[in-house]
């Protein structure tokens, strides 16, 4: 991963420690990619991050956009590593409030092995609301493809689903930034 530390690691939720580390690393890697492309990259304020789901603000000339960065996710079997074919979408967060699908960011950027997929937030939300059956609640994350699952057994109020990344990539406002995988340039 990159060496940029523009985004500082969030301290708090011990139950998400590893995911927070991965998330911060993904945010910093995307920040590096933005800088490499000539953008001015600024981290969001703590308030923007917590309440608006905005991680980074990118500016280049008169073009400015905000991003909520999602680190690579493991699939339904964590022992098999990362799954770039499917991703998680969050309708409600662990507190039961609007999840990051209802972000105020312009884009949700999904990290994959070799790139970042930028999905227009409204377009992604509209698609998810039409293809995910939020009335079909399943008992296991393994069964949450286009259905919803939550961790109420842990006292959490989240509502999440899994969708295929190919559907995100197919959205007409989606764009992709390849990662600079060769750091020896």
Where do the protein language model's features map onto the residues?
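Short connector loops at helix/strand junctions that flank enzyme active sites
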Residues: 51-53, 62-66, 102-105
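Beta-rich nucleic-acid/ligand-interaction surfaces
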Residues: 47-57
